[in-house]
């Protein structure tokens, strides 16, 4: 790998990590470095000094990118998204947003209140719901979901071709949600990921009251696979504790 390309990728990684401060205001790369240093100082290992030297190098890189204590202030949300997707853009320029509208993608375990949030915040928008597709196709949550996802994606494509804003209502628990984000962006939409979470007991209570309750052991398995969305995954990412 060429040195220039490697430097570009390292800088992009630093900027992506720092951007998570938009989702969790107490998060900073300064704090992350301090945590890594404390963890290493509390352990006994032959490579301790080498690891500590790497932390100091990371601090220098982060300071050079101007995001030690805050996310980098990009020229525009479109510029930020372009860089996070790997584009070679100047981070301070204000790229024009040529998207035709926004598609919302929900993320969260069953019972976190995705349907309630959609009703309160997206009145009038079409909703592509994987739960509804499952009911129509008579597929349970424990069965293969391939045909469910395919049918939902076809409905999404129909709306995208019409340049119709809509909500993609699914658990979207892992980084594979990038496939959906990529589909929506390929059709010229900008994407907002909305991540909802709640305490475990409340999560189970809400799920039990649903018409199509998901077995608790299935939700427990989903929790083990959950990867909360990071800020770099879409043009807008929001976290809500509900």
Question: What do these predicted ranges mean?
Answer:
Residues 165-170, 193:
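Short catalytic-loop micro-motif centered on adjacent basic/acidic residues
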Residues 187-206:
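Conserved phosphate-donor/acceptor-positioning beta-strand/loop module used by diverse small-molecule
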Residues 104, 124, 201-242:
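Conserved GTP-binding G-domain of TRAFAC-class P-loop NTPases and closely related GTPase folds
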Residues 102-122:
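Glycine-rich phosphate-binding P-loop
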Residues 93-100, 159-160:
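Phosphate-binding P-loop
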Residues 115-166, 200-205:
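Conserved substrate/cofactor phosphate-moiety recognition/catalytic segment
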Residues 168-180:
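Acidic, metal-coordinating catalytic cores used for nucleic-acid/nucleotide bond scission
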Residues 1-87, 92-94:
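C-terminal subdomains that position terminal phosphate/3'-OH groups for nucleotidyl transfer/ligation
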């Amino acid at each position: 790998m060429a040195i220039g390309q490697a430097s570009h990728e390292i800088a992009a990684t630093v900027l992506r990590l720092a951007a998570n401060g938009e989702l969790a205001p107490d998060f900073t790369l300064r704090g992350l470095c301090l945590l890594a240093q404390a963890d290493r100082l509390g352990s006994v290992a032959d490579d301790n000094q080498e690891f500590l030297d790497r932390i100091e190098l990371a601090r220098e890189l982060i300071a050079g990118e101007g995001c030690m204590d805050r996310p980098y202030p990009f020229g525009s949300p479109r510029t930020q998204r372009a860089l996070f997707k790997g584009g070679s853009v100047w981070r301070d320029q204000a790229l024009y947003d040529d998207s035709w509208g926004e598609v919302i993608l929900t993320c969260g375990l069953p019972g976190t209140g995705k349907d309630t949030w959609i009703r309160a915040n997206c009145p009038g928008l079409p909703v592509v719901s994987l739960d509804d597709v499952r009911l129509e196709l008579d597929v349970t949550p424990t069965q293969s979901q391939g045909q469910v996802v395919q049918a939902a994606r076809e409905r999404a494509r129909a709306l995208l071709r019409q340049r119709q804003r809509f909500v993609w209502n699914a658990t979207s628990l892992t980084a594979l949600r990038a496939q959906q984000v990529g589909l929506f962006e390929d059709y010229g939409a900008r994407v907002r990921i909305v991540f909802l979470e709640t305490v475990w007991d409340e999560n189970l209570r809400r799920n039990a009251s649903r018409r199509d309750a998901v077995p608790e052991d299935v939700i427990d398995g989903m929790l083990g696979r959950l990867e909360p969305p990071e800020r770099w995954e879409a043009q807008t990412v929001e976290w809500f504790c509900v």
